[in-house]
Each structure stands twice: as structure tokens, then as C-alpha cells.
Amino acid sequence: MSLDIQSLDIQCEELSDARWAELLPLLQQCQVVRLDDCGLTEARCKDISSALRVNPALAELNLRSNELGDVGVHCVLQGLQTPSCKIQKLSLQNCCLTGAGCGVLSSTLRTLPTLQELHLSDNLLGDAGLQLLCEGLLDPQCRLEKLQLEYCSLSAASCEPLASVLRAKPDFKELTVSNNDINEAGVRVLCQGLKDSPCQLEALKLESCGVTSDNCRDLCGIVASKASLRELALGSNKLGDVGMAELCPGLLHPSSRLRTLWIWECGITAKGCGDLCRVLRAKESLKELSLAGNELGDEGARLLCETLLEPGCQLESLWVKSCSFTAACCSHFSSVLAQNRFLLELQISNNRLEDAGVRELCQGLGQPGSVLRVLWLADCDVSDSSCSSLAATLLANHSLRELDLSNNCLGDAGILQLVESVRQPGCLLEQLVLYDIYWSEEMEDRLQALEKDKPSLRVIS
């Protein structure tokens, strides 16, 4: 539990009656109330409602992962329907809300002009519930800016009501509808709504929505026309290389200032990677890129690394987990690690880099100019024979703060070499992640002693 005079933050705690009685006065005065996965019941929703009625300071209420149901949510919302309520953020994610409960929520939105964020993911709202919700969102008194609707059982039929909201609300900034089967037709309707909207959208998240390569032309227009757009999440959609070719002209548009692009598991190969590299070279604004789960291969890795060495590329975070890389591409990544002055985070797990590849990476990391702070090498077929190189690198490199070696074939001999380096004052590593690695009791004692002797370090296993 986290508690100060302004916030109450409790997660994953079954609250006894005595504990609940202790917390009730705090619900009446805290600006931020988070009761995440606390086993709240309908009866306690009535207590929450009563407390909120007399709490004019409340700015954020998070009740996610409690089985409130429609009746419980109704009770809570009644507590917010007071003239003094100034709530800005409401999270009812995974609260067993259904479409039937959306009518009350819709009515409440009309009475909360200060509400800016609404999180409703993981509730079975359905198209009928979404229609009711949008009626409230369209009210002039509603000034919502951010709406999250992941896993809400929506179809393409929900996209026209959402498009109407986008057209009507110039203050709208973020829309998340990931993991709903809105498919190609629904995405096209949303894009048309955004095209017609004066809103300054900052984030659009459409992961696992059935987006196709044909939709990428529509999305290209959105990226080009919305200079405010900073994040575009399209992961787990069948875009393919054709889709990337359609999307990239929008990303290259002079007005595009996209910062984050998530296109993991999109069926992209080295060919599509080539189109994307043109964007990376031209757009200093692009800082975060996920290509995880695409079959880029070593050729795709080479293209990416050559681009990362270009002065126009200022990428800070690159996720290329599960991209079918081998040790053959590691010399290219080594050059990037040695020379690139912007890349801070590299997720390259679940690629067959093997010991030879990791040794190549260590050569780059050991150079004086290396700035990388986080490196994920989980499940890369690394063995104890790589650990001498890794150990030397940890002493030579003064930027690396987190290293993940989970699910590799390491034993006591390799881990001992890492421990001997990490325990040195000159090693600045703060987090060593070793999930699914097995060692002796003696090594367990060494790791516990290491954490005790060096409080700045966490060993996670």
C-alpha cells in the first residue's frame, strides 16, 4: 500500500472489515484513490459512493479488477454526481461492467465536465453498450480527452458512433480500441471520422483489430494530417510489406512528428524494413519502435543497423525480439552499440545470437562511447562461455543499468563471473534479471549477499 496525505493506493489486497473501516475516512479526503484488485463487493461500493459524495478533492478514482458489476458501478457513479465533484480520471477496467450498465455511465458523463480520462477496457460492453456510452460522450458538458476500450467485444458497428464522437470533440487526444474485432471496415470508418475531426489526436491504438494493408492508405492520411499524433500502435495486424509501403509516405510527411510506432507481429520482412528505414533516416522525432515478432532476418537487422548509424536517426528504444536474427547480424549491432549516441534500450531477446553473437555485442558495449542503458538478451542461446565477455563488459561500460539474461543455459560458473564483476564499485548495473535460470544453494547465498552488500542492485529471478 502507498499512502500520503493526498493519495491512497492499494493493490492486490483482500480488505478485512476492520481494514475497510480504517480506510473509509481516507476515501473522504484523498485526491487520488486507487483500489486495484481488492475484492470490492456491492456493499462496499455503497460505502465508496457515500465517501465520494463528501470528497470535493477527488481527482482520480481507480477501481480496476474488482467484480463490481453493473449494480456496483451504478453505486459508485452516484457518489460522483454531486456539484462539488471535480474528478479528472476514472478507471473501471475489468469491473464486470456490461452493455446494460452503460446507460447509467452515459448519464453520468453528462454531469462530469472535469472528467478527462475514462478507462473501460476488459468489460463486455458490446456494440449496444458502446452506442449508449457515445450518447453521453456527445453531450456538450462532456469534455473527455482520453478513452480506453480494449477487449470490450466491439465490432465494426461501434466505429460509426466513435467516429461521431471524434468529429464532435475538438479536445479529444487519445483513443484505444485494441483487441476488438472492428476489422477493415471499422478501421476505415474511424479513419474517416478522424479525417473530418478538428481534434488534435496524440495517440491512436489499434492493436489486434483486424487492420489490413488496405487500411494503411487511410492511416497514412491520418499520420500526414494530424501533426499532433505522437503514438501509433498497430501491433498484431496483417499489414505486411505492402502495408508498410502504404504507411511510410504518411510517416515521411513534413508535418508528421510521430514519436512511438508499435508494429510488432505485422508480417513485415526485410523488404518492409527497408521502407521503414527511410523514415528512420528522415525523422529525428521517432524515438520508440517495436518490430518484435516480424521475420526480418539478418538482412533486416543489417538494414536497421546501417540506418541507426545515420545522423538523422535518433531512435532511443528498439524492440526486435523474435525477429529471426542469428549471430551473423551481431557485428552490425555491435557497431551501433559502440557508435550510436541515442539508442538507450535494445530488446533483442528470443533470437539465436548464441555465444559468438553475444561476444560481438560485448565488443560494442565495451567501447567508451556506448550509451545503452537497458539490454534484453533473454532466450538467446547464451551459455557460460559468454559470461567472461559479459563480466568484462559490465566493468568497462558505465551506462548500462539493466541486463536481462533470462532463460539462457547459464550455470554456477557463468553466474559467478557475473557476480564478481557486478560486486565491484565500478560496475553501475542496477538490475540483473535471471528468470528461468537454475543455480546451486551456494550460488543463491552469493546472490543474496551481493544484494545486501550492494543496495543499489536488484537481482530478479
From Swiss-Prot:
Result of altering W262A: Binding affinity decreased 5000-fold over the wild type for RNASE2
Main location: cytoplasm
Modified residues (Phosphoserine): S91
Signal peptide start and end residues: none
Annotated effect of mutating L296P: In IIAE12; uncertain significance
Pfam family, one: LRR_6
Result for mutant: W319A: Substantially decreased binding affinity for RNASE2. Binding affinity decreased 5000-fold over the wild type for RNASE2
Localization in the cell: Cytoplasm; Nucleus
Keyword Nucleus set for record: yes
Domain of life: Eukaryota
Chain positions found as Phosphothreonine: T82
Repeat region (LRR), residues: 20-48, 49-76, 77-105, 106-133, 134-162, 163-190, 191-219, 220-247, 248-276, 277-304, 305-333, 334-361, 362-390, 391-418, 419-447
Keyword terms, alphabetized: Acetylation, Cytoplasm, Disease variant, Leucine-rich repeat, Nucleus, Phosphoprotein, Repeat
Modified residues (N-acetylserine): S2
Outcome when changing W376A: 40-fold reduction in binding affinity for RNASE2
InterPro entries: Leu-rich_rpt, Leu-rich_rpt_Cys-con_subtyp, LRR_dom_sf, LRR_RI_cap, NLRP_innate_immun_reg
GO molecular function annotations of the record: ribonuclease inhibitor activity
Keyword NAD: no
Reported disease: Encephalitis, acute, infection-induced, 12: An autosomal recessive disorder apparent in infancy or early childhood, and characterized by acute encephalopathy triggered by viral infections and febrile illness. Neurologic features of the acute episodes include seizures, hemiplegia, decreased consciousness, hypotonia, abnormal posturing, feeding problems, and respiratory insufficiency. Disease severity is variable, ranging from death to normal neurologic outcomes.
Protein name as annotated: Ribonuclease inhibitor
Originating species: Homo sapiens (Human)
